[in-house]
Amino acid sequence: MTQLNTQFGKVAVLLGGNSAEREVSLRSGQAVLNALQNHGINAIAFDPKERPLWELNELAIDRVFIALHGRGGEDGTVQGALEFMNLPYTGSNVLGSALAMDKVRCKHLFKSAGLSTAPYTVVDAKKGFDAAAIMQQFKKVMVKPSHEGSSIGMAQASTPQELEDALSNAFKFDSQVLVEQWISGREFTITVLGDEVLPVIEMTTPNGFYDYQAKYQATTTQYHCPADLSPADTEHLQAMALDAFDLVGASGWGRVDAMQDQQGNFYLLEVNTVPGMTEKSLVPMAAKAHGASFEQLVVRILEQTL
């Protein structure tokens, strides 16, 4: 029988929620819950879709592990509620969460700070747009709803018609959409844990890009950890990731995604403040390459609330 670990008190794992990433969050949260309980921590699952947050007080919760992805859980909303309730929680604060979740604001920040990021434009559902002019400027683009994760609502476009179709779909998720120059090359992700940067992971997929299907369903997606990069490139990419993480005000733990074009230049994509923690997730993979088990990773994240 596992000895009870009392230093954390009673912990609620927030999972599920109302976002388009609910199913992924349920899997992440269950994995986190199992790890905490295996470590002897008094932890329970709490789904904000099923019950109001104020019940956390009734349950005498001491701290919260946030495993919510997307809107309502990763955008500063639940963080603000927990701040109001004086409950310590994992990950970034209200501002860091809100900024990182907003792809458009992140791009503006990266650009203004001189960090390398792909050329882009922003399309608003309430305003008109010229698909032909955008495609003439960029040739090939990636379309991303500003506030979604797990590649939800994302699509490539190489013609004005494809762009119109991609925007029409993206507008179902968000009124502001990021249209980004397509970078053809290698895709990487870098985990930040406390003040450490973990080994870089490279993802390869026949899907064209690392989309929802490649992330959670495909058996053809391959992961290389640590990535096959020179020591200089690895150091540069890790430093760039840490700069981006700090710039948006993220803290505690998270993941930064980046690309390398065929000329060897690196470009920042986005910062994730509550990355996936499923069996296929990248943060546990990086932690394992760093010598930490999944349980050790989860406990280390929770320790940041003490």
Curated annotation (Swiss-Prot):
GO cellular component terms, semicolon-separated: cytosol
Residues that, per the record, bind ATP: 134-189
Domain ATP-grasp: 107-303
Pathway recorded for this protein: Cell wall biogenesis; peptidoglycan biosynthesis
Superkingdom as given in the UniProt entry: Bacteria
Residues binding Mg(2+) 1: 257, 270
Pfam families: Dala_Dala_lig_C, Dala_Dala_lig_N
Gene3D superfamilies: 3.40.50.20, ATP-grasp fold, A domain (3.30.1490.20), ATP-grasp fold, B domain (3.30.470.20)
Catalysed reactions, semicolon-separated: 2 D-alanine + ATP = D-alanyl-D-alanine + ADP + phosphate + H(+)
Record SUPFAM superfamilies: Glutathione synthetase ATP-binding domain-like, PreATP-grasp domain
GO term, biological process aspect, one: regulation of cell shape
Record's cofactor remark: Binds 2 magnesium or manganese ions per subunit.
UniProt family annotation: Belongs to the D-alanine--D-alanine ligase family.
Function: Cell wall formation.
Name of the molecule in the record: D-alanine--D-alanine ligase
Organism: Pseudoalteromonas translucida (strain TAC 125)
Lineage: Bacteria, Pseudomonadati, Pseudomonadota, Gammaproteobacteria, Alteromonadales
